[in-house]
Regions:
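Short glycine-/small-residue-rich Rossmann-like dinucleotide-binding loops
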Residues: 69-71, 95
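Short, hinge-like loop/turn segments at secondary-structure boundaries
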Residues: 107-111
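Iron-sulfur (Fe-S) cluster-binding modules
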Residues: 1-66, 77, 81-89, 112-155, ...
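Short gly/pro/ser/thr-enriched loop/turn and capping motifs at secondary-structure boundaries
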Residues: 96-101
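A short acidic (Asp/Glu
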Residues: 77, 102-103
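Short substrate-entry loop that stabilizes the transition state in hydrolases
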Residues: 74
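Active-site-proximal loop->helix
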Residues: 103-106, 269
Length: 307
């Protein structure tokens, strides 16, 4: 019998749903083993019945549930609770669901400050009232899914990788565990590290030094070239079977999208230590808290005291 699969998306761009499609041919094999019973991005399933006849939202029971996106409003929260009730195994899909992702950068502001900026003060907006009566009420901040309901598995990344999604679903169907990497991005980076002092950070628009066509193992570490790279404080795994991290393959620094090395890790502390080893002063970074927690702000970023 095919396993029943439900999926919901909250505060997210939709990239993790595209990742499911990007699984490619292996997705055809997976679809023979699962029955999709709820997935708003693909199918029209009304939460309160097809004609709105139900008083409470309802999601079909499922063996596996996927949630992408962080929890930003009260409807997201209620849906997360319903998914947890109806799904035997619940997976947080992507860094927004795992750690809050980019939307959680708003946690450094109060809800009122966010609404005022978006609906009254942005350059392209015609100032008007807040649409609080027409849309679900915002929560006080962006929450990771695991802060609201227990989660059985996390698949980080912005977006996560097709290989990881396929591997996790296959493992579940076969009754196997699917552990995340315990190493850092730096541990899987093939570039040359000499721990030489740098001194000054460079802008990302400046081109790093490398020889086109030559292997990455001949390129000097991007952070040692003076570019801010979050590899020391970021969980490995984005490279998949290729090993080499995705951003590094494109000659770009790690942005930190796979989140912290562990649940208790502090990316800001880890990055401070990494920067000090090559003589970089963290004070060169204007917004250190948000920069080092760019994808992991749900439980880490709060409004700063106003001066």
């Amino acid at each position: 019998m095919a396993a029943r699969l439900a999926e919901e998306w909250f505060a997210i761009c939709g990239g993790c749903e595209v990742t499911i499609l990007d699984i490619g041919e292996p997705l055809l094999d997976l679809l023979e083993k699962v029955q999709i019973v709820h997935m708003p991005v693909l199918m029209d399933h009304k939460l309160f019945g097809q004609t709105g006849e139900n008083a409470e939202m309802e999601i079909p029971e499922a063996d596996v549930g996927l949630i992408s996106g962080g929890i930003r409003n009260e409807e997201n929260k209620q849906l997360a609770l319903e998914m947890r009730r109806k799904c035997k195994t619940l997976i947080a899909l992507g860094s927004c669901a795992c750690y809050g992702g980019i939307p959680a950068l708003s946690n450094i502001y109060t809800t009122q400050e966010v609404l005022t900026k978006v609906y009254r003060e942005s350059v392209s907006t015609e100032p008007d009232g807040f649409p609080c009566d027409e849309i679900p009420a915002l929560t006080d901040r962006v929450y990771a899914v695991s802060e609201v309901v227990p989660v059985d598995m996390m698949l980080p990344g912005c977006p996560t990788t097709p290989e990881m999604v396929a591997g996790a679903l296959t493992a579940l169907l076969e009754g196997r565990s699917f552990p995340l990497a315990t190493k850092s991005v730096c541990d899987e980076c093939p570039t040359i590290r000499e721990k030489k002092s740098v001194g000054t950070l460079k802008r990302r628009l400046e081109a790093p030094e490398f020889t086109p066509g030559r292997p990455l193992s001949e390129m000097r570490c991007l952070m040692e070239q003076g570019y801010l790279c979050l590899g020391p404080a970021t969980r490995a795994g984005c490279g998949g079977s290729q090993g080499t991290p995705r951003c590094i393959r494109a000659y770009m620094t790690c942005e930190g999208c796979f989140g912290p090395l562990s649940e208790k890790a502090n990316p800001m502390v880890d990055m401070m230590g990494a920067l000090s080893t090559i003589g970089l002063d963290p004070k060169q970074i204007p917004d250190r808290s948000a920069t080092f927690n760019r994808f992991a702000g749900a439980g880490r970023l709060r409004p700063a005291p106003r001066r």
